[in-house]
């Protein structure tokens, strides 16, 4: 919650709303901010703190980003990611009205099917964005925003991992049932594929999941199951083409 208040520093740093939006685009769409090593090493200067080129280092000083390597900064954890995503939604006037989401999640408690939750996200969350936004967003935005919506309603049932490192690669999203709940040992792996509007017709025409995508998520599920044999694994591939097409396949023969 302390970070929630500190996020208002973005407004102070960027001075105008458009600059704040650009900063958040970099954080929640690209997932990283380029920074200058000399700026990071330089002596603290209050005047420079509000300079446009110094924004990434200013956020680092405020504890709102962390260093990924010698060139870029990233958000420090999933809690920060969720908070920034909430702030992004506020700035872009994206509603989080529970009445649009709760019915789908109540049904999930009965049938445990993930596909309706993806469809709910596509309609009620992505459906609020203007068409031009879909040329800018990417798979990183899709996985992070879907996680943020899921975490509002399923955080008592699952823990979440975004871009989980596995021997076969990085899984976009992993849901793991919490011990002591009815979801214990229920593990879901979700792989997202995002397409621009020009590819919507191609995605719409797909009758089955592409074999290479199914194989990818199978490998991720196998990696997890080798480490945790008691898990009941389920795996999914989600195709989203701008705001036009959404298709979800559950991959079998894990």
Language-model region placement:
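Nucleic-acid nuclease catalytic cores
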Residues: 205-251
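Extended alpha-helical interface modules used as scaffolds for assembling large macromolecular complexes
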Residues: 1-203, 209-213, 254
């Amino acid at each position: 919650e302390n970070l929630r208040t500190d996020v208002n520093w973005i407004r102070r740093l960027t001075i105008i709303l458009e600059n704040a939006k650009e900063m958040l685009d970099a954080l929640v769409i690209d997932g990283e901010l380029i920074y200058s090593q000399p700026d990071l090493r330089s002596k603290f200067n209050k005047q420079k703190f509000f300079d446009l080129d110094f924004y990434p280092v200013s956020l680092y000083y405020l504890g709102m980003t962390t260093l990924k390597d010698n060139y870029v900064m990233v958000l420090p954890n999933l809690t920060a990611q969720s908070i920034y995503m909430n702030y992004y939604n506020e700035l872009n006037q994206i509603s989080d009205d529970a009445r649009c989401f709760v019915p789908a999640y109540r049904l999930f408690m009965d049938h445990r099917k993930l596909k309706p939750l993806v469809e709910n996200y596509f309609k009620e969350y992505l459906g609020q964005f203007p068409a031009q936004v879909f040329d800018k967003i990417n798979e990183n935005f899709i996985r992070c925003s879907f996680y943020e919506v899921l975490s509002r309603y399923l955080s008592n049932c699952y823990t979440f991992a975004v871009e989980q490192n596995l021997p076969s690669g990085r899984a976009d999203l992993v849901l793991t049932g919490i011990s002591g709940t009815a979801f214990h040992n229920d593990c879901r792996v979700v792989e997202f594929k995002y397409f621009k509007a020009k590819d919507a017709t191609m995605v719409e025409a797909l009758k089955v999941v592409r074999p290479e995508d199914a194989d990818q998520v199978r490998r991720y599920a196998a990696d997890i199951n080798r480490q945790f044999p008691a898990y009941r694994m389920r795996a999914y591939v989600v195709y989203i083409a701008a705001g036009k097409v959404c298709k979800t396949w559950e991959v079998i023969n894990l």
